[in-house]
A protein has these predicted regions:
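Catalytic Walker B motif of ABC-type/P-loop ATPase nucleotide-binding domains
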Residues: 162-165
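Conserved ABC ATPase "signature" region
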Residues: 108, 113-133, 185
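Short helical segment in ABC ATPase nucleotide-binding domains corresponding to the A-loop/adjacent helical element
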Residues: 100-108, 118, 227
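Hydrophobic anchor residue at the start of the ABC signature
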Residues: 151
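Conserved signature/switch motifs of ABC ATPase nucleotide-binding domains
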Residues: 136-139, 157
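Conserved ABC transporter NBD signature motif
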Residues: 68-80
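Helix-to-loop junction immediately C-terminal to a conserved catalytic motif
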Residues: 60
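The feature captures the beta-strand-to-loop junction immediately N-terminal to the Walker
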Residues: 45-47
């Protein structure tokens, strides 16, 4: 990463949640220092309740670190902004809006002309494979289709960094596998700096350029970093894939 542009940098980020008027303090993150280069697909992996979602929310500007700082293109992150797009585990679509309406919402709020925003939204509807569903409402869509809308909406707003918080955690195994394939395909077509959070090592190896693991207890601390030098598209049954997955599983003591 020596000659590559650093897009996101976390410097000694720590987070303590306070309860009962500050009488109870819960340390969630401790001394997280991390750099993500432009167009890198970074996956943060760890078990539940290890602080990885909190770290993503701090990068998004939705949480403030207790100590430390986050920088985007060298500028300190002080709150949410259009330069970061986020896809959540729970579906966050507007139920009264169609697929087209949901995807173009951010562009509309930004004052973009209708013709232009429809053109952009249409491009991403096509990219995520939802042609023919432009006029469908969220209640008419499957879970996988809803997340495709969420991903298309995030891409349509053209953020500098895309943040995904266990976006496939609520999907069945088959749909989750298909969405992993779609995510890898879309990223290959529309290169973007991506930070993806998951508790699945298998998913991490399939998607990542680099994997960062967090310890499985609070406060979350960085444990290891792995560069994934496997060709794309990847196959879960390839020898090299299985060897890397096994190595990470053994070294992090996480169960698949």
């Amino acid at each position: 990463m020596t000659n590559e542009t650093i897009k996101i940098e976390c410097r000694n980020v720590a987070k303590i949640f306070k309860q009962r008027g500050g009488k109870v303090q819960i340390p969630v993150l401790d001394s997280i220092s991390l750099s993500v280069v432009e167009n890198e697909f970074l996956v943060i992996v760890g078990p539940g309740q290890c602080g990885k979602t909190t770290l993503l929310r701090i990068i998004a500007g939705l949480e403030t670190p207790t100590t430390g700082n986050v920088f985007l293109d060298g500028k300190q992150v002080t709150g949410p902004g259009p330069d970061r797009g986020m896809v959540f585990q729970k579906y966050t679509l507007f139920p009264w809006k169609t697929v087209m309406g949901n995807i173009e919402m951010g562009l509309k709020l930004g004052g973009m002309a209708k013709k232009k925003r429809r053109e952009i939204a249409g491009h991403y509807i096509s990219l995520v494979g939802l042609q023919g569903f432009e006029k469908a409402y969220p209640h008419q869509l499957s879970g996988g289709m809803k997340q495709r809308v969420g991903i298309a909406r995030a891409y349509a707003n053209d953020p500098k960094v895309l943040l995904l918080d266990e976006p496939f955690g609520q999907l069945d195994a088959q749909t989750r596998y298909l969405m992993e394939q779609e995510t890898a395909r879309i990223w290959s077509a529309e290169k973007k700096t991506v930070i993806f959070v998951t508790n699945s090592i298998d998913e991490a190896v399939y998607l990542a350029d680099r994997i960062v693991t967090l310890e499985g207890k609070l406060p979350g601390r960085m444990k290891s970093s792995y560069v994934v030098n496997l060709p794309r598209p990847r196959e879960h049954i390839d020898k090299e894939f299985l060897e890397l997955r096994h190595m990470i599983t053994q070294e992090t003591e996480l169960l698949l």
